[in-house]
Amino acid sequence: MMAMFEEVEVEAYVYPTEDINKVKKAMLNLVPGLKFEAFDKGEYMILVGKTRDKRALQRLYELFRGQQILDTARMMLEEGYFGEEIIIKVHKQVAYAGKVNFNEESPLGPITITIRTKEPQKLMKWLAPRTKDGVPIE
């Protein structure tokens, strides 16, 4: 896959009741190869992972197809598209189990994925093409 993005940033809040390594695993289940930094905010920590690895979005590509959620994924990408950024939020516990769920309503907050790209349309078409009867048509 050619590089259609400059950087992928993944962010989540980590609360005192949570294991930071489990939150890291949840984030890595979606975007492998992240380099992490943690910021202590007192009541919680903010965990930020970044990567410029050109294969960073391959896992999401596979999950969207494996879970047959291309239409939902496309809708979420389009909703989260602002200029040269695409932002999606996914459920943290579901990510820990190695799946994607766009229901971000979780007491522990979502995982936020920000894709920085100069070619957002091209990237969306690759990551989650439009479908007809579940089959990609782009």
Curated annotation (Swiss-Prot):
NCBIfam families: PRK00447.1
Pfam families noted in UniProt: RNA_binding
Family: Belongs to the UPF0201 family.
InterPro entries, per the entry: PAB1135-like, Ribosomal_uL5_dom_sf
Superkingdom as given in the UniProt entry: Archaea
Name of this protein: UPF0201 protein PYRAB09730
